[in-house]
From Swiss-Prot:
The modification Phosphoserine is found at residue 96. NCBIfam families: glmM (TIGR01455). Keywords: Isomerase, Magnesium, Metal-binding, Phosphoprotein. It catalyses: alpha-D-glucosamine 1-phosphate = D-glucosamine 6-phosphate. Mg(2+) binds at residues 96, 230, 232, 234. CDD domains: GlmM. InterPro entries: A-D-PHexomutase_a/b/a-I, A-D-PHexomutase_a/b/a-I/II/III, A-D-PHexomutase_a/b/a-II, A-D-PHexomutase_a/b/a-III, A-D-PHexomutase_C, A-D-PHexomutase_C_sf, A-D-PHexomutase_CS, Alpha-D-phosphohexomutase_SF. This is Phosphoglucosamine mutase. One of its GO terms (molecular function) is magnesium ion binding. It comes from Thermotoga maritima (strain ATCC 43589 / DSM 3109 / JCM 10099 / NBRC 100826 / MSB8). The keyword Phosphoprotein applies. The active site is at 96 (phosphoserine intermediate). The gene is glmM. GO terms for biological process: carbohydrate metabolic process; peptidoglycan biosynthetic process; UDP-N-acetylglucosamine biosynthetic process. It holds the Pfam family PGM_PMM_III.
Amino acid sequence: MRVKYFGTDGIRGIFGETLTDELAFKVGKALGEIVGEGKVIVGKDTRVSGDSLEAAISAGLTSMGVDVLLCGILPTPAVALLTRITRSFGVVISASHNPPEYNGIKVLKGGYKIPDEMEAEIEKRLENGSFLTRSVVGRTKSFREGRDMYIGAVLEMFRDLDLTGEMVSLDLANGATTTTAREVFEFLGAKVEVFNDSQDGLLINQGCGATHPRFLAEEMKNGKVGFTFDGDGDRVIAVDEERNVVNGDRIIGILAVGLKEEGRLNSDTVVGTVMTNGGLEDFLKEKGIRLLRTKVGDKYVLEKMLESGANLGGERSGHIIILDRSTTGDGLITALELMRVLKRSGRKLSDFAKEIPDYPQITKNVRRTERMSLENENLRKIVEESTSRGYRVVIRPSGTEPVIRITVEGKDREEIEKIVEEISRVLES
């Protein structure tokens, strides 16, 4: 059986175990065969394994005659923007929100994550194990000006946004946004309070960032609004002036209304996933906005956006795509767009967020085993019975970890807990 290397967000694993320098070198060679004698832009987050993987994948690419432009530490959306500007391929070495021992390889082309068909083409070459011999050898060059190009592009997008006097708190997750976020907010006039801005590769996402938003909610002192990013900068979660966490669903709801009022919300449509909270769906419906759902993963959100013509979509986790700003989830751009909506309305973030219901939702991870099956009659009965009583049940394999995720949503938290435990017992039996 052919090995599946790519998950929902590139290749990912624990460095030295499921993700090695040898694999990265081969990915470089496989991608190099597809690229030909072009160039590939490479960026990374702050993980300690980033240097080693960067060297390995660069060696694979240059051995196939491809020039490699090294950006150093830079958010995933920044690399995506650079590949769009230069019409080239890109590689980001990052495991996004995962702990420091993980790392990953994301492949981009012309601003977008590569499609499943191209991932399959790379996997096929990895499985075959034999690569073309090229007479031309590529070069590795520093491309640190890529950071300035990205910052310049973001500032141009928000040239009319004046944040003078605004107090903003940022949690940079000790990750890639340490190179961009503070500078952009300060340039726009904000007074910035920063947490977790170390580039020590052992601290990324550790008790901080978008997967631990309570850290910022508890620690921010001066901010009227806070933003907490993940390790590679493609997610953001907000914190309001009352120190309440504002999740991705609520951010999407606020942006949807703001864009609609400006006449910028295409087809009055927003794209979410099967995990999008029903409270957001009900709120959008009241505002005359349609919600389309798709599979979990920002690549699938983007596919549905392109298919439907929507220009706003995202996930509860904070992956939010504003297509007339960026071709991928960009935490910094999302944060600035939210600030723009707040400034334009004159309202507080808490006032907006409270308007959007957030129905109780519990997610539990169950370690996946070979004998575990989702095609189970008892499981089907539980789901059908729960659904008939108004609960929404989603059971799916994670695209980035060896677990099955159980999510149940409804209006009675105690009943949700019972349903989650019942499903867990069936899966583990």
